[in-house]
């Protein structure tokens, strides 16, 4: 697996929505609903290391809410997975294919900004990121 940090993966991403580059945290944050990124890669697997910062629930201050992200398939229409990001820094499998190939996936934040912050720290693939 080849790992790409913030400075290495940025040239390969197409950002959409409100994103914020935080070099001190080493992450690209996409905190608003439907913001995120699109990336092309070769191989079978794409994993993302996500920094998730929980937020207190408005109705129950003892409850911490976490952001949900979704992965949209190559057709741009189908939501193929939904993940609740519950750890400060955690690896998530974004795409897993049976056969090696070239794939394009879009990752979006599904939850509201008030449900926590979400930052992309690193990407990892068994192939390579593509322009």
Q: Can you describe what each PLM-predicted range is?
A:
Residues 1-131:
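N-terminal secretory targeting modules
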């Amino acid at each position: 697996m080849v790992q790409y940090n913030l400075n290495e993966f940025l040239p390969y991403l197409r950002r959409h929505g409100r994103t914020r580059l935080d070099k001190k945290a080493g992450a690209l944050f996409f905190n608003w609903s439907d913001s995120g990124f699109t990336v092309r890669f070769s191989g079978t697997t794409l994993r993302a290391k996500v920094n998730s910062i929980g937020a207190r629930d408005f109705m129950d201050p003892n409850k911490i809410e976490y952001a949900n992200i979704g992965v949209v398939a190559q057709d741009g229409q189908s939501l193929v997975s939904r993940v609740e990001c519950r750890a400060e820094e955690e690896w998530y499998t974004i795409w897993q294919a049976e056969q090696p190939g070239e794939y394009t996936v879009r990752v979006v934040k599904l939850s509201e900004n008030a449900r926590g912050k979400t930052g992309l720290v690193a990407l990892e693939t068994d192939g390579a990121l593509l322009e």
